[in-house]
């Protein structure tokens, strides 16, 4: 195989770095990819974050493979017009929704970590009264709107679970 180079804007989980020890290639992590320097492109697209660069790549006739990911991600919805309702952009998972954490930091003096730990225990062992663990599948591939982020949130527990599932694709 000829020598090749992989250029990326991030390798947060170190997947490409580990792969580079098994297969010989040059790994470049850059702030911004110069499209004039690439011959082929693979885009892992989630929440349509890369639509603009995909258009640019197609306009330059660079061979491209787009892999659409159905990941869940907890996001902050402070200041949105939808507030405690779902929208096309996100599914509300805070208080008052069936996805909300039944444990509050304001009751019993529990801190954030403790109420998330309690939520995770009930989630892992399917102990909620108003929702079953299997119902959370409905949230796969969605942004999970909450007021906690960027701090730790029960939405992180939900997202981690959903993102660990094999979607068969």
Where on the chain are the PLM-derived regions?
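Charged, structured surface patches that assemble and position nucleic-acid processing machinery
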Residues: 44, 63-66
């Amino acid at each position: 195989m000829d020598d090749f180079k992989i250029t990326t804007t991030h390798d947060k989980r170190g997947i490409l770095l580990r792969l580079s020890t098994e297969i010989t290639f040059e790994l470049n992590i850059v702030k911004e990819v110069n499209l004039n320097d690439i011959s082929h492109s693979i885009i892992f697209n989630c929440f349509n974050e890369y639509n603009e660069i995909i258009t640019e790549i197609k306009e330059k006739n660079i061979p491209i493979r787009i892999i659409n990911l159905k990941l869940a991600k907890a996001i902050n919805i402070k200041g949105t017009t939808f507030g405690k309702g779902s929208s096309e952009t996100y599914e509300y998972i805070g208080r008052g929704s069936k996805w909300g954490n039944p444990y509050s930091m304001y009751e019993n003096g529990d801190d954030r970590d403790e109420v998330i730990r309690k939520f995770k225990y009930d989630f892992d062992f399917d102990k909620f009264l108003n929702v079953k663990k299997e119902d959370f599948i409905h949230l796969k591939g969605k942004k999970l709107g909450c007021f906690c982020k960027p701090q730790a949130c029960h939405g992180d527990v939900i997202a981690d679970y959903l993102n660990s599932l094999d979607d068969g694709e």
